């Protein structure tokens, strides 16, 4: 399995499985001198961890992070930063019945076909449990970006199933389990998910992430465009099925006279492009939307096959989210941070001496 690393200059390599002893990662390329503590990382992990509401999996993982290397006397040393999160609430017995069968919608079938072996306990390496490591690494990137460039990265749930969530304020996001930017709609969201659960079903969601304060110039055309790398990172999240930058697919119905963001001496007049032009940051807010599919594990009888190809009916058991998107916001933020820090370092490496007089906004 060769796809466990993301980044060019600032990289994360993750390891571990859902029901193994631990998950972890190695963050390489972080500049020396960044003040970094366990608390800096833990506060981000606490936003993502399971068992925090009735609408997410009831697996109780404290997600306590350990920094194994790369930090001395509270500062990064420039060497690889080792991160470890021990698994403490595995129930492998819940998965014994699927050792030789393939759950519909999961990676069971493809992992078996590709590797000829799979860890069936909780999905093994394909489990979203691994995303805790991304959030931990993203916390480092978030802090560096904020201190070095004043970049702020914030996300929210903008749609749950067929319910659009109007944006009200960023302050509302931290006050509810949905990461919804609108508190008046919470009763509707609660009732909707309760109904989905009572029907023994699941539903998808859309997460919106905004990076504010990104300077002009980040991105490496033509193959490592900033928007291309953002899309690559987001599609690497479990259950992600689509990514939009700026107006995204709505651009199909727009005219050029609308979509093209006009410039004025004071800056851009609009931001349909989502803060990226030609694969390079424009200085505007970078805006992305990520679509997450419904949870594949639902307590209904489904048709499938076993590893010998025999037809069967199966019903998934275990502890699962009725909507994986409920906990996805910190993960989406983390992936945005990882990409932006990598591109900040790449831009600095080649273009640090470039200076132009045109207004930058």
From Swiss-Prot:
It comes from Methylobacillus flagellatus (strain ATCC 51484 / DSM 6875 / VKM B-1610 / KT). It catalyses: 5-O-(1-carboxyvinyl)-3-phosphoshikimate = chorismate + phosphate. CDD domains: Chorismate_synthase (cd07304). Pfam families: Chorismate_synt. Homotetramer. It is an enzyme of class 4 (lyase). Its EC number is 4.2.3.5. This reaction introduces a second double bond into the aromatic ring system. GO terms for biological process: amino acid biosynthetic process; aromatic amino acid family biosynthetic process; chorismate biosynthetic process. InterPro entries: Chorismate_synth (IPR000453), Chorismate_synth_AroC_sf (IPR035904), Chorismate_synthase_CS (IPR020541). Its cofactor is FMNH2. The gene is aroC. GO terms for cellular component: cytosol. The keyword NADP applies. NADP(+) binds at residues 48, 54. Transmembrane segments: none annotated. Keywords: Amino-acid biosynthesis, Aromatic amino acid biosynthesis, FAD, Flavoprotein, FMN, Lyase, NADP. Pathway: Metabolic intermediate biosynthesis; chorismate biosynthesis; chorismate from D-erythrose 4-phosphate and phosphoenolpyruvate: step 7/7. Reduced FMN (FMNH(2)). Belongs to the chorismate synthase family. The keyword Coiled coil does not apply. This is Chorismate synthase.
């Amino acid at each position: 399995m060769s796809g466990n690393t993301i980044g060019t200059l600032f990289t994360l390599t993750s390891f571990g499985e859902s029901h193994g002893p631990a998950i972890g990662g190695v963050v390489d390329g972080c500049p020396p001198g960044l003040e970094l503590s366990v608390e800096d990382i833990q506060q981000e992990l606490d936003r993502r961890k399971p068992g925090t509401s009735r609408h997410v999996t009831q697996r109780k993982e404290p997600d306590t992070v350990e920094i194994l290397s790369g930090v001395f006397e509270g500062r990064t040393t420039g060497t690889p930063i080792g991160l470890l999160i021990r698994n403490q609430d595995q129930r492998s017995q819940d998965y014994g019945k699927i050792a030789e069968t393939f759950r519909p919608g999961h990676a069971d079938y493809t992992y078996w076909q590709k590797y000829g072996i799979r860890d069936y306990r909780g999905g093994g390496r394909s489990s979203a449990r691994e995303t805790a490591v991304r959030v931990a690494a993203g916390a480092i990137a978030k802090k560096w970006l904020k201190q070095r460039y004043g970049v702020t990265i914030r996300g929210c749930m903008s749609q749950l199933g067929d319910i659009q969530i109007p944006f009200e304020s960023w302050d509302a996001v931290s006050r509810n389990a949905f990461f919804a930017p609108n508190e008046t709609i919470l009763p509707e969201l609660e009732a909707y998910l309760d109904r989905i659960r009572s029907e023994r079903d699941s539903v998808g969601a859309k997460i919106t992430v905004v990076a504010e304060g990104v300077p002009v110039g980040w991105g490496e055309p033509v193959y490592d465009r900033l928007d291309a790398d953002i899309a690559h990172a987001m599609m690497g999240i479990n259950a992600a099925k689509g990514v939009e930058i700026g107006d995204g697919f709505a651009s199909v119905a727009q005219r050029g006279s609308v979509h093209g963001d006009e410039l004025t001496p004071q800056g851009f007049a609009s931001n349909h492009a989502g803060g990226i032009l030609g694969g390079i940051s424009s200085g505007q807010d970078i805006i992305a939307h990520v679509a997450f599919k419904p949870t594949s594990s639902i307590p209904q009888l489904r048709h499938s096959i076993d590893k010998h190809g025999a037809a069967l009916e199966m019903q998934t058991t275990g502890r699962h989210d009725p909507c994986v998107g409920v906990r996805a916001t910190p993960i989406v933020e983390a992936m945005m941070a990882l990409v932006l820090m990598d591109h900040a370092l790449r831009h600095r490496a080649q273009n640090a001496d470039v200076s132009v007089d045109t207004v930058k906004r």
